[in-house]
C-alpha cells in the first residue's frame, strides 16, 4: 500500500520514464491512495508504457488521477478499482480487459477514458463520474459474455458530455453474448460522433432514464445522439 496522507508538496505515486513497465502478478495487491498527484503517470514520451495486471488487484483511491498518459494496460483475471479521483480516472490509455472486474466510479471528471477499449468476458462498471463514464477514441469491443454498466455519469452540468462517447472513425461492437446498460445518466446516454456501432442480434442494449437539461450537446439525444455535436 502506498498512502500519501500527510505528505508535503505534490508527489506522484509511480512515474514512468521511457520504456517502463509495471507488472502485477500472482495474487499481488497494489493500493495507491491519497496522492495529490497521480497514481500512475507517464513522462509524455514515445516509449512503451505498459501496465500488466495478471491474477492480481490494483486500487487507485482518492488520488488526482488513476492512469495519466497513454499506457497499454492489459488486465487479465484481475480486479481494478479506480475510484474517488479528484480528476479523471484515466485519460486515454489503451485498455485490454479479459476475465476481469473493472470499476471506474465516483471520479471528479471522466471515468474510463480510453484510446482502444477491449472488454472480453469481463464486468466493467463506470458509475457516478462527473464527466463521461466511458469515452473511446479508437476501437471499442464488448464480447464473450461481458457486462458493461454506465450509470449516474455526466454530473457536471457545465459540460455537454455524454455518458458514453464513441469519438473517432473506428469500429465499435457489442457482440451477441454481451450486455451494455446506459441508464440514469445526467446527459445524453450514448453519443456516436463518428465510426460505426454494431450491436449484434442477441446482445442486450438498454439505454433508459438519461436526461438532457441543457443545450451543450445541442440539447438533443437523451438516449442516443449520432453525428457531430458541439465537439463534446
PLM features: residue spans?
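Short linear motifs in low-complexity or flexible loops
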Residues: 21, 50-52
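Extracellular beta-strand/beta-solenoid scaffold signature
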Residues: 5-18, 33-47, 57-70, 79-94, ...
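Tight coil/turn sites that cap or link beta-strands
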Residues: 19, 27, 123, 139, ...
